[in-house]
Curated annotation (Swiss-Prot):
<dbReference type="InterPro" id="IPR016009">
    <property type="entry name" value="tRNA_MeTrfase_TRMD/TRM10"/>
</dbReference>
<keyword id="KW-0808">Transferase</keyword>
<protein>
    <recommendedName>
        <fullName>tRNA (guanine-N(1)-)-methyltransferase</fullName>
        <ecNumber>2.1.1.228</ecNumber>
    </recommendedName>
</protein>
<keyword id="KW-0963">Cytoplasm</keyword>
<keyword id="KW-0489">Methyltransferase</keyword>
<keyword id="KW-0949">S-adenosyl-L-methionine</keyword>
<dbReference type="GO" id="GO:0002939">
    <property type="term" value="P:tRNA N1-guanine methylation"/>
</dbReference>
<feature type="binding site">
    <location>
        <position position="116"/>
    </location>
    <ligand>
        <name>S-adenosyl-L-methionine</name>
    </ligand>
</feature>
<dbReference type="GO" id="GO:0052906">
    <property type="term" value="F:tRNA (guanine(37)-N1)-methyltransferase activity"/>
</dbReference>
<keyword id="KW-0819">tRNA processing</keyword>
<dbReference type="InterPro" id="IPR029028">
    <property type="entry name" value="Alpha/beta_knot_MTases"/>
</dbReference>
<comment type="similarity">
    <text>Belongs to the RNA methyltransferase TrmD family.</text>
</comment>
<comment type="subunit">
    <text>Homodimer.</text>
</comment>
<dbReference type="InterPro" id="IPR002649">
    <property type="entry name" value="tRNA_m1G_MeTrfase_TrmD"/>
</dbReference>
<dbReference type="InterPro" id="IPR029026">
    <property type="entry name" value="tRNA_m1G_MTases_N"/>
</dbReference>
<dbReference type="InterPro" id="IPR023148">
    <property type="entry name" value="tRNA_m1G_MeTrfase_C_sf"/>
</dbReference>
<dbReference type="Pfam" id="PF01746">
    <property type="entry name" value="tRNA_m1G_MT"/>
</dbReference>
């Protein structure tokens, strides 16, 4: 393949990724050679006859904790094969993952995503192996698989050549610090709802002005925090 991004994903449920990697943008990025995504089963590095990867937390309490040994074994094996720019752990107790983060990650060559599961990940893994932590929002999921896919999609769509129209990614929401404007397509009128006349005018300067004004209005109404304004 061409000199694309190598992404290794560590998970206790690797089959979760099968359908997603074979469809949509991630499949396109792989087919075009812009990404090489490999999923690793942490159970292959588990302990004992039953390949144990979790255990109860010290101090008691509900839930199970992902043990350090399988994670260290898998990460260190991969690190012996290549140098990683980042070992990423999606977790709700981290700063938000933003568009700027996706842009930065898209310029890296070797990334590793560590998908947590169960109640928690042993803290020693986070202290010793993880180099970046991101939250996708104030919500708790059953594992890091969905957040990892979200981040992979976000970073790969801004890699030049992945999308059919690279300019499309550059005009997305947040790329300019605001939400994107509204979009319309055919027909020009549907069930009494009309497309704004300016978009049908063919006057490019006026269309661009409308889009900027619409984006500003939508941002002020939906995400005033992006403009530094108070949120009601």
């Amino acid at each position: 393949m061409m000199d694309g991004i190598r992404i290794d994903v560590l998970s206790v449920i690797p089959g979760f990724f099968d359908s997603v990697l074979d469809n949509g943008l991630l499949a396109i990025a792989r087919k075009k050679g812009y990404a090489d995504i490999v999923v690793h089963n942490l159970h292959d590095y588990g302990l004992g006859r039953y390949r144990q990867v979790d255990d109860s937390p010290f101090g008691g309490g509900a839930g199970m904790v992902l043990r350090p040994e399988p994670v260290f074994a898998c990460v260190e094996k991969l690190q012996s094969e290549r140098c990683y720019d980042a070992v990423i752990f999606p977790t709700p107790d981290a700063r938000p993952f933003l568009q700027g983060d996706a842009n930065r990650l898209s310029r890296m060559k070797n990334l590793m995503f560590l998908c947590g599961h169960y109640k928690a990940l042993d803290e020693r893994v986070r202290q010793s192996l993880v180099t970046m932590e991101y939250s996708i929002g104030d919500v708790v999921l059953s594992g890091g698989e969905i957040p990892s896919l979200l981040m992979m999609d976000a970073l790969l769509r801004v890699v030049p050549g992945v999308l059919g129209d690279s300019e499309s990614a550059l005009t997305d929401s947040f790329q300019t610090g605001m939400l994107d404007c509204a979009y319309y397509t055919r027909p020009p009128e549907f069930r009494g709802m009309k497309v704004p006349e300016v978009l049908l005018s063919g006057h490019h300067a006026k269309i661009e002005q409308w889009r900027q004004e619409n984006a500003l209005e939508r941002t002020r109404r939906l995400r005033p925090d992006l403009l530094g304004e108070d949120v009601e």
